[in-house]
Curated annotation (Swiss-Prot):
Residues found modified as Phosphoserine: 101, 796
Post-translational modification: Phosphorylation at Ser-101 by PLK1 strengthens FIRRM-PLK1 interaction. Phosphorylation at Ser-796 by PLK1 negatively regulates its interaction with PPP1CC.
Function, in words: Regulates PLK1 kinase activity at kinetochores and promotes faithful chromosome segregation in prometaphase by bridging kinase and phosphatase activities. Phosphorylation of FIRRM by PLK1 negatively regulates its interaction with the phosphatase, PPP1CC, thus creating a negative feedback loop for maintaining proper PLK1 kinase activity during mitosis. In complex with FIGL1 may regulate homologous recombination.
Residues recorded with modification N6-acetyllysine: 845
InterPro entries per the UniProt record, alphabetical: DUF4487 (IPR027902)
PANTHER family to which the protein is assigned, alphabetical: CHROMOSOME 1 OPEN READING FRAME 112, FIGNL1-INTERACTING REGULATOR OF RECOMBINATION AND MITOSIS
Keywords for the protein's UniProt record, in alphabetical order: Acetylation, Centromere, Chromosome, Cytoplasm, Cytoskeleton, Kinetochore, Nucleus, Phosphoprotein
One family name in Pfam for this protein: DUF4487
Name of this chain's protein: FIGNL1-interacting regulator of recombination and mitosis
Cellular compartment(s): Chromosome, Centromere, Kinetochore; Nucleus; Chromosome, Centromere; Midbody
GO molecular function, one term: protein kinase binding
């Protein structure tokens, strides 16, 4: 029979079958179905294919045994159906290039293909509906080819609809109605299929094919999610909801087969996409409180979508955590990306505080329990604390914020989880070390006034806290809860951070260490002081690490119990030469009054003897090191001993300083570092004794300073010169020396005021202000303000105005670019010996030293007085600004109110 004849015969048969009643279809099913299936396989006409498919589904499917559907029907027709559908997609893509409103033939062809595709999807929907209607519980093995083939068609349909703008270009309007119908049919088919799959139960004894089919279904639905995410948000969310539901429902049999990494990655991508959309909408919303605002309603819907995806991730992670080692990097990046868009990060989205709180209360709260789950994952710990994390600059602060959240959670975790986070190995740091390391990487956020949500004490108003304060407080809280077995790791992390060349890191570690000294036992504090003292003694020379250790020693010494201070003095006696340099780092104010007087006397005697030894020696540069140590310790005594330094000791120090000044050589000050140090120390000591120093010596000193400044000495020498100059304001200079000293002072100030080093210029302004406030020689003030440039600088300094304006955004950008390259290597590791039980009671800790209220009053009053004196001095030499009179009137009113308060008591 010819092909045309066969088609005609098939057409007659199909026409006849379409008129059969239900009873005949049921009776003739065994004989007719094989013939229909054969025709379906052999036919080359799309129209005939769809006719056969509709007859099978609508007339014969209802009479088939549901237990044998796979063998008798689905495995026979679905492969051919997929082949036909894919061919139609290819045909559409090819014909669409020729589509136009003038080319009716192509237009009709394309529309016919789209209509045929709609009919195919409708027939498949009928198959799914029949299976759902005839069974209460579905065995996947009886229909295992149906879900996979249907999902292939659904995905192909959605992809074609998504790409329709590019496929049909500017002629989309010619077929948009059919494309919309096609999308709706595919949407309906997927909903029907998900209802079917929801009726599937997989037991432990399920065969491997059924398990693989369910896994394939979940993965296919995940692929569909990536297609429809930008097409229909509600449908996208419902598909994810179904994926999570089925994954959890069948987890006992499919967990080892699922592509967990891809699922987690897709979920995280959808979370971030929704989150960024939410932020963009928040930035566009001008009135977040207006409920009728369309942008605000869309913002709320998107925010709920964020919460939904986060909850989905939470549930999935909870059940499959042991299978997620490969997903930990993705989860880590998710947290960092989200944190980077919130204060105090430089790259925060510009949204209102109300919207920030709304996002935090709706979305971010879900991430908190997710992090709690991840704490137990060794892979997550390894990822977050990796030694070679190499994060971009904008994620450095988010990393620290994440670690701070972790340390807040660790105290409630079992000891093994705490140990996991607090110990380190070859590939990862401990969490404490990681915080300190990353803290030194974001100088921008620390330099800006980034204030976080405040803290409120009992009966007190909320006070905003800085980023530094927040991190420091959380670290201290964690240290207070740390298990004793982890103290060696704490000590090692603190010491490594203190020895860091990054100032912020070092200061943070010192603050935490001081809290530990205050919170821990007196014995622990004494042990730490001894440890730091030994480290200082072992430093080979002056370096950043020595400076950091010396500051730490000075601070820790205040927390020592008196009994332990006595032991320290005995162990590190200043009478021993190798101990003397330690005492330049210890504030004598930390000692009790009696002990302070005793140690002051002893140290002063040792140091003055050392100076006299140098004076009676050969005065070589090689011997200057020991002299500088003695001078440095003497300066510490003078600055901190207070009344413990009696008149006899003051006289001895003054005499030896005067004798040493005679050996100062201007040329050596410029070229020899040891001479520079001695020169600076002598200037500071002279400044301390300025009221008792012989005026002839002061005249000599000023002459030397004039020569030194002309030679442009190192900055630290210039700073010492400024300290000395500021002290001269306290001094009354006799008429005989005034003409020699005062002009030189104005030259020195003028030279330093125009220095290009901004730090030196700032110190010059401060020193000049102190001098002007205290001096009785007012003529020198006008001499120093000789040029208009210097006068403007002084006025700007006093008015606290910025010399160069900069926008807030520019400040943030510049701060963000100032990334500090921190040298971070473990300098030392320290471990404590295991504590042994002891019968004696621990020593009483050092009582906290409160600043007396009267001293606070006096300090505040002196500050106000100095400010008025400075204003008075300026008025004598320059014209008053227009606003000054009104400000003085306001100040007078405030003084009257203060008087009334004092009188009322």
């Amino acid at each position: 029979m010819s092909q045309n004849g066969a088609v005609a015969t098939n057409g007659v048969m199909l026409e006849e079958l379409s008129s059969w009643p239900e009873e005949i279809c049921r009776r003739e099913l065994p004989s007719v179905l094989p013939r229909l299936l054969s025709m379906y396989q052999c036919s080359e006409s799309w129209i005939e294919h769809i006719r056969i498919l509709k007859i099978i589904v609508e007339m014969f499917l209802p009479h088939m045994n549901h237990l044998t559907l796979e063998e008798t029907l689905f495995s026979q027709i679905l492969p051919k159906t997929i082949q036909l559908f894919d061919g139609m997609i290819c045909e559409l893509t090819s014909e669409a290039r020729e589509l136009s409103s003038q080319n009716l033939e192509i237009q009709i062809t394309i529309r016919n293909i789209l209509q045929t595709m709609v009919q195919i999807i409708g027939s498949l929907t009928g198959c799914v509906h029949h299976v759902c209607a005839t069974q209460e519980s579905i065995i996947l093995g009886n229909i295992h080819s149906l879900p996979s083939f249907i999902l292939h068609i659904i995905k192909s349909t959605f992809v074609h609809c998504k790409n329709s703008e590019s496929v049909y270009s500017g002629r989309l309007h010619l077929v948009s109605d059919l494309l919309q119908t096609l999308f709706k049919e595919a949407y309906s088919l997927q909903k029907q299929l998900m209802e079917l799959l929801d009726m599937v139960c997989l037991g432990p004894s399920e065969d491997e094919n059924s398990i693989l089919t369910m896994v394939e279904v979940i993965h296919s639905l995940m692929d569909i999610c990536s297609v429809i995410s930008s097409m229909d948000k509600a449908f996208h969310a419902n598909t994810w909801k179904f994926i999570i539901k089925q994954s959890l429902k069948h987890q006992s049999v499919i967990r080892s087969q699922l592509k967990h990494k891809e699922i987690i990655s897709s979920l995280c991508e959808d979370i971030l996409f929704s989150f960024h959309s939410c932020l963009q909408l928040a930035e566009q919303t001008t009135e977040p409180a207006a409920q009728d605002n369309a942008d605000y309603r869309l913002f709320q819907k998107t925010l709920k979508l964020c919460r939904f995806f986060a909850n989905s991730l939470l549930h999935y992670t909870k059940e499959f955590l042991p299978f997620l080692p490969d997903s930990c990097r993705t989860l880590h990046q998710l947290y960092l990306q989200i944190y980077s868009k919130f204060p105090p990060c430089l790259y925060t989205a510009k949204i209102s505080k109300v919207q920030q709180e709304e996002i935090a209360g709706t979305f971010l709260v879900v991430l908190d329990p997710l992090l709690s789950q991840l704490l137990k994952s060794q892979s997550f710990v390894q990822t977050v604390l990796a030694s070679k994390l190499d994060l971009p600059h904008e994620l450095q602060l988010p990393q620290v914020l994440l670690l701070v959240v972790v340390v807040d959670k660790l105290p409630s975790q079992p000891e093994d989880v705490q140990t996991l986070w607090c110990t380190e190995d070859m590939t990862r740091m401990s969490i404490l070390k990681a915080i300190f390391y990353n803290f030194g990487q974001f100088s921008g956020e620390l330099s800006l006034p980034a204030h976080l949500q405040g803290v409120k004490g009992k009966g007190q108003a909320e006070v905003p806290v800085t980023l530094y304060q927040r991190i420091c407080v959380h670290l201290c809280t964690f240290v207070a809860s740390l298990h004793p077995t982890l103290f060696p790791e704490l000590d090692a992390a603190l010491l490594n951070a203190v020895l860091s060349t990054n100032m912020s890191t070092s200061l943070l570690a010192m603050d935490v260490w001081c809290f530990l000294a205050r919170y821990g036992t007196a014995e622990l504090g004494a042990h730490h002081v001894t440890l730091v003292a030994h480290l200082i003694k072992s430093c080979p020379g002056r370096c950043v690490q020595l400076t950091n250790l010396s500051v730490l020693l000075r601070r820790l010494f205040f927390f020592m119990a008196p009994a332990h201070q006595v032991e320290f003095i005995q162990k590190f006696s200043p009478r021993e030469a190798d101990n003397l340099h330690l005492w330049q780092y210890i504030s004598f104010q930390a000692l009790p009054a009696d002990l302070r007087k005793q140690v002051t006397c002893e140290v002063t005697g040792v140091c003055t003897a050392q100076c006299r030894k140098w004076l009676s020696g050969s005065h070589t540069l090689a011997e200057l090191d020991s002299l500088n140590t003695a001078l440095s310790v003497l300066l510490t005594v003078c600055n901190s001993a207070g009344e413990a330094l009696d008149s006899r000791q003051l006289t001895a120090v003054t005499e030896v300083v005067g004798q040493l000044w005679a050996f100062i050589n201007v040329e050596q000050i410029i070229s020899q570092p040891h001479v520079q140090q001695a020169f600076s120390l002598l200037l500071q000591l002279l400044a301390f004794f300025i009221q008792t120093v012989d005026l002839q010596l002061i005249s000599q000193v000023v002459n030397v300073l004039t020569l030194v400044i002309k030679l442009e000495p190192p900055d630290h020498v210039s700073l010492a010169v400024l300290d000395f100059l500021s002290s001269l304001g306290k001094l009354y200079i006799s008429q005989t020396l005034r003409d020699k000293v005062l002009p030189s002072l104005s030259c020195i100030v003028a030279s330093l005021m125009v220095n290009r080093n901004w730090l030196l210029e700032q110190h010059t302004l401060e020193a000049f202000t102190q001098f002007a406030e205290g001096t009785k020689h007012e003529e020198i003030v006008s001499q120093c303000l000789g040029s208009e440039e210097i006068k403007n600088k002084v006025v700007s300094f006093l008015e606290k105005t910025e010399s160069v304006g900069e926008t807030e955004a520019a400040t943030a950008d510049n701060s963000g670019e100032q990334k500090t390259d921190t040298f971070w290597e473990p300098v030392a590791k320290v471990t404590l010996e295991e504590a042994k039980g002891s019968a004696f009671q621990p020593c009483t800790k050092r009582a906290r030293q409160e600043l007396l209220l009267e001293e606070e009053y006096r300090s505040a009053f002196q500050t106000a007085t100095r400010a008025l004196e400075t204003t008075e001095a300026l008025l004598k030499h320059s014209r008053a600004p227009a606003w000054l009179l009104s400000e003085l009137g306001a100040l007078q009113e405030r003084i009257e109110k203060l008087k009334c308060c004092v009188l009322r008591g």
